[in-house]
Amino acid sequence: LLVLTFLNEHRAGPSKRIVDLGCGYGPIGLMIAKVSPHHQITMVDVNHRALHLAEKNKKQNQLDNVIIEESDGLSQVENEHFDFVLTNPPIRAGKNVVHRIFEEAYQKLKTQGELYVVIQKKQGMPSAKKKMEEIFNNVETVNKSKGYYILKSQKG
């Protein structure tokens, strides 16, 4: 749902810098990289196994517009700012971790940059939406399906 929503809005147009935060084995970032090869994708995760699988999937798909980095949130991604941050946040890590991810996204976004979040209503969507509003001063539900919500905030 996150990939479809994002690509519907940003498939074409000029090249953008996108970070897939908490990429896991890579389904979000790699799909966007494959469908929109003009975008530059940085994929980050703290889990070594996930990064290994993401790297393997990147090679199998022959994607040269993807960089994969180890980082706890965006704390180790230095000297880079992004047009978009996309995340399926690690809900089981707890509310504090999820909220820190939103704060780091705000810091790493360019002005007018956007944070896209996919989250289930029953796994903290109302709390996430409230925190995004608090940080960005805006949040909107841009899509929803089967209990999943796509929330978007823009940095002013």
Regions found by a protein language model. Name each.
Residues L1-T87:
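Conserved SAM/SAH cofactor-binding pocket of Class I
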Residues I32, E104-A105, M132:
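Class I S-adenosylmethionine-dependent transferase superfamily signal
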Residues Q120-I135:
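Conserved class I S-adenosyl-L-methionine
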Residues K144-G156:
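Core SAM-dependent methyltransferase catalytic element
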